[in-house]
Structures are given as structure tokens and as C-alpha cells.
Amino acid sequence: MSTKLILSFSLCLMVLSCSAQLWPWQKGQGSRPHHGRQQHQFQHQCDIQRLTASEPSRRVRSEAGVTEIWDHDTPEFRCTGFVAVRVVIQPGGLLLPSYSNAPYITFVEQGRGVQGVVIPGCPETFQSDSEFEYPQSQRGRHSRQSESEEESSRGDQHQKIFRIREGDVIPSPAGVVQWTHNDGNDDLISVTLLDANSYHKQLDENVRSFFLAGQSQRETREEGSDRQSRESDDDEALLGANILSGFQDEILHELFRDVDRETISKLRGENDQRGFIVQAQDLKLRVPQDFEEEYERERGDRRRGQGGSGRSNGVEQGFCNLKFRRNFNTPTNTYVFNPRAGRINTVNSNSLPILEFLQLSAQHVVLYKNAIIGPRWNLNAHSALYVTRGEGRVQVVGDEGKSVFDDKVQRGQILVVPQGFAVVLKAGREGLEWVELKNSGNAITSPIGGRTSVLRAIPVEVLANSYDISTKEAYKLKNGRQEVEVFRPFQSRDEKERERFSIV
């Protein structure tokens, strides 16, 4: 009897242990651990009296591109835990494989290229330098190869690669290796937001990058200040270094026994002055189309189902097959559209499930000439607004009821808006476009005006007593705008008549 109890108890412990290890890969991250994010977030009180719209404060050049870093020691960056980086890859350039100790989300602002993702424990289901193996239904006249012939024709096998283009959102978990190649004719420009307050980051408040090749190039900041010397260590950790350069030659040679000493030296990045973005003009990659990627996922499932008991571990079936890309211009991503004012496109955990695990999301907002959005605030996230086109005016009001930002913004600037701070944006004569990167898998905004606003949900009598106005004025206040979040500019009666006449 006692033996059965001991066995049962041991089995329960084993099941609980396995469940604890696998829980991060499962869906439903609403109940996040408290010790991670809060530990870093509340080490100091944040008293934000002023926000700034800023451009990168440091540029590091490589052979085939530039890495630009925003000053993350300002109050708004430090308190929200955001770290922002912009990478410019020249045509033919290759951003070397690397990983970070913090999850991040990347927006492709310009260009096209190829992205690679390497997930530990997942199979190599992609092939290069060989004829692609299509499903039986698509082979047509192709004869069936024997197993040995198929093995010999596979060529190089690797994990998933996919094409990226302007408007794509690309997330990455902490510790997952990614690389990027620009095979287009224009510069490939991307902006990345790293979440330093994520519970995935275990060590301290610093974001660290780790490269698997190359050697960094150090350059001084474009703007000199006393504070820059104190920031040097943080920036160097963010820029990263080749982790193989720290291992001895003997260890690497023992590990990679089929390579010579010269290759070992190149693995360590010795005498490599190219930086972390290198020229790879001759690099040719066979990138699967969307239907081929779907087939590879199915093919990987079949492979894992063969042999042994025919079972797979569940983690491979879920995490290995997750998508790592979503384009803002996909019709299903349209959240709000106003033909006279603009539109809002959203990529969150509903459209890209991996964002539920990372607790990150993004919005793309397009405002037409003189159109307005807001005032509105984020219920459950901070946001970093990166302007991609045009210019406009932004006002942000904090918890003391005072303006903490009232200025114009333009292309290339980032404005960090903390959770709960109300923001309104008005486009200029050329319109205004921006991307909002947020630290929540399903960020929720609450508008003050419009058909879905908080004022619309409050009874007229409550509004009248709250603002000490008549019920008639309260009704007009509540129902004056029928649009949703994005508002067309105000027009006088004469302007409306001219518009009606021009349409006729």
C-alpha cells in the first residue's frame, strides 16, 4: 500500500513539474507572474512631468548598414521599460544571427528581405539547393523517388525562413535567434521595441544582445554629454558581442571537429572589422511562398508523427508552427476606417497568437489632412509612437491634469506615452502616419469622444451634473460625434457648402 502511495505521489510531482515547464508555451497569459515585471518597474517612483519626441542618440556603422539607438535613460523610457533600436540594412546586407534576453517586436518601415527564425528543439523542415518536395497532389508528372534518392536530393536543411516587406510586424521571444537579409534594391529599415520590464528577462534592468558571428564596431555618439559615459556599459550590452569570441580555440575545435583552425578563428570573429551588418550580395535563398510554408508545417507534423508511438510532444505542434509575421495591410487587421479621416490597423494576439506569449502588440494609424484621433488612453499598456510619414501636433496630459507634451512630431521621432496618459493627435497638411508599439498582447484604448467613447456610455443626467451644464448641452456633448476614434476635421457651414457643391 505504501509503495503505491509513493509511486502515485511521485507521478503527481512529475506531472506538475512538466506542466510548470511547459506553461509559458500555452495560450492564456492573462495571469502573468507578478515578480517579473513589477520587480523592475517599481524599483523607483516615476514622476513624469515632461515627455519628449526624440530621434536616435547614437549611430553605429557596419560594413553594410547602420544601427541606431534611442536614449533609454530618459524618464519615459526608463519608467516604461522600453528600449528602441532602428536598423538600416543596405541592399545585399545581412544582419548576423543574434538573440536578446528580452522579447521584442519589430516593424518593417521600408524595403523587403528575408527573415530567419531559429527555435530550439524544432525540426529543420525547410530545404535549399534542391528541388522542392511538393505534396502528392501537386507533383503532377513527377515520378516518385525512392527513399535513398529523396535523402540525397534534400540538400541543405534549415528552420523556417520567410519573406518580409514594408508594413510587416515581426515578434521575437527572448533567446530566439533571428537574422535578416536584404535581397531588395532599397534600404531595408526596421524599428524594434524591446520590453525591458518583461518577466521573460530574468537578470536585471539592462537589455542584452548576443551575436553568433562577427565582431562589433565601436563608434562615439553623435552628441556629446557627461551622461553618455555613464550610459556606455548599457549601450555596449545592447549592441552585443560575438559570444563565440570568448571561448578558447581548443574547446571550439573539439566541438566542431570537421573544421580547420582558420575556420575556428573566423567563428571567434578574430580580425573581423565588418561589424554586425555584413555585405552578402551573393547570398541566394529559396524562400517558400505562403502555401509552401503551410505545407512545411503539415510535413513537419507528419514527420513527428512517424516512428515510436506516433506521438508528438505538443510543444512542437504549437510553438514550432507559430507564425512570426503579420502585415498591417491585411484586410482583417483593419480596426477602424473613416473614408474622410483615416484608419487604424491592429496586430495583436488575436491575429498573431505568439504575441499572447510575448505580451506585445502594434497599431498602425493613418490620418488624412487635418484629421484628429483622440483624446484616448491605454487601459493596460504603455505605447511608443514612431512617426513614419508626415507631421502633426500631439498633446499628452498626465495624471495631474497638466500637459506633459504639446508639440509637433515628424518622421523618424518616437514619443513614449505611459499607461493612462491621455493623448490627442492632429494631422498636418500632408497627413500623419505612425506605428504604436505596446507592451500588451491585446492593448485596449478608451476614447473620450465619439460613438464608442466613455462619454457616450454615461447617462445624460450624470454628465449634466458632472460638468454643471444643462441636459441639452450634455446631450450634444454626448452625441455630437458619430464617428469612431478617427474624426474628420471640423468644417464651417461655408466649407460644407463648398464641399457639397464640388461633389455635385
UniProtKB/Swiss-Prot annotation:
SMART domains to which the protein is assigned, alphabetical: Cupin_1 (SM00835)
Signal peptide per UniProt: 1-20
Keywords recorded for this protein, A-Z: Disulfide bond, Seed storage protein, Signal, Storage protein
SS bonds (residue pairs): C46-C79, C122-C320
Source domain of life: Eukaryota
Biased composition (Basic and acidic residues): 144-158, 218-231
Domain (Cupin type-1): residue spans on this chain: 51-265, 326-475
GO terms for MF: nutrient reservoir activity
Region described as Disordered: 128-158, 214-237, 289-314
InterPro entries: 11S_seedstore_pln, Cupin_1, RmlC-like_jellyroll, RmlC_Cupin_sf, Seed_Storage-Functional
Family that this chain belongs to: Belongs to the 11S seed storage protein (globulins) family.
Assembly with partners or alone: Hexamer; each subunit is composed of an acidic and a basic chain derived from a single precursor and linked by a disulfide bond.
Further comment found in the protein's record: The sequence of the probable beta chain is highly homologous to the N-terminal sequence of BW24KD, a major buckwheat allergen.
Chain's role: Seed storage protein.
Protein name: 13S globulin seed storage protein 2
UniProt source species: Fagopyrum esculentum (Common buckwheat)
